[in-house]
Amino acid sequence: MFSPLIDQLINSLRHLPGVGPKSAQRMALHLLERDREGAQNLSEVLAKAVEHVHRCQQCRTLTEQALCNICSNARRNRKELCIVETPADVIAIETSAVFSGYYFVLLGRLSPIDGIGPKEIGMDVLASRFAEGEIEEVIIATNPTIEGEATAHYISERAKAQGIKVSRIAHGIPIGGELEYVDGGTLAHAISRRQEI
Amino acid sequence: MFSPLIDQLINSLRHLPGVGPKSAQRMALHLLERDREGAQNLSEVLAKAVEHVHRCQQCRTLTEQALCNICSNARRNRKELCIVETPADVIAIETSAVFSGYYFVLLGRLSPIDGIGPKEIGMDVLASRFAEGEIEEVIIATNPTIEGEATAHYISERAKAQGIKVSRIAHGIPIGGELEYVDGGTLAHAISRRQEI
């Protein structure tokens, strides 16, 4: 309905997650009518990010440096390694400020049906870190989904084979949550994994 | 929290309307983890759009051509001119398929407090179209806000001075709407502007 170039921009904006045709139209017109500088800036930063952002050599998170901020910080605890699925998970745990070790980002989870095997989640890199002998505890923080649990199981077997202690983050009722509003699956898990006090 | 370039990308994405810090983070990671081609494409189309999209010489809507699709269509009704605030309004009216004349896009509305006067809404261009003598009816479809009404009043005075018939689109209860859920302002307007049947 718009001119070809504007239609093309609307279509390109739909690559963004959670953006449907109406939002994409609103975004395109907003940028062109009122924020051309912002549009120009977004275009340049996007191109730069696509060109320069790659995976951290050590933990596989996304970064434009050879080593990410966390891996290049020598003052963290070398004995603990936390394994997560995505870079956003690293930020979530960092924000909670309870973990001072290093991370390893799988950038996915084992899912044979989607063709994601040990190689795709960087198991070779992870195995060589296990073999270095510096790590004393591996904390597995993959999501509590079927694939996440399978991934956790697979990694824990590999770590235990190297004599490393393995733990899984706790799942149950969120702090401040009310039982009444918690889903059945979580509640069942919380009861079966109850701990003596 | 992320590496500088990723943080910069997240900030740039916040220029998009309706995108807060969480959505911007999700968008940035989605593009970098899973859709680099889409990101590259968006960057290129954005740069091209910022460079080439300007205002249609005749109706002031956004287009990369000298004249937009509608203005360059000689088979429309030259006697009717519909005045709207934004390019999105043109598309909305075109979709309803009840109007076959030409448009004029103000790209805003009179708002002295924001420094938007007759010049900013292209009143000089519009006045010269009124003066051409081809237009028989001007349909004013600015939004029913205080500024939109003031703009409608101002334009109608200018058009009437040239002997052109002026009309305003109808405001009232939306078709298919239920009185119970219509706001008081709309209901008051609908009652005071009731029409004999």
UniProtKB/Swiss-Prot annotation, chains A, B:
Give one GO biological process term: DNA recombination
In terms of InterPro entries, this protein maps to: DNA_Rcmb_RecR, Rcmb_RecR, Rcmb_RecR_Znf, TOPRIM_dom, TOPRIM_RecR
PROSITE patterns assigned: RECR, TOPRIM
Q: Domain Toprim, which positions?
A: 79-174
Molecular function terms from GO? DNA binding; zinc ion binding
Q: Which Gene3D superfamilies match?
A: 3.40.1360.10, 6.10.250.240, RecR Domain 1
Q: What keywords sit in the KW lines? A: DNA damage, DNA recombination, DNA repair, Metal-binding, Zinc, Zinc-finger
Q: Name one Pfam family in it.
A: RecR_C
What is the recorded function of this protein according to its Swiss-Prot or TrEMBL entry? May play a role in DNA repair. It seems to be involved in an RecBC-independent recombinational process of DNA repair. It may act with RecF and RecO.
Membership in a protein family: Belongs to the RecR family.
This chain belongs to the protein called Recombination protein RecR
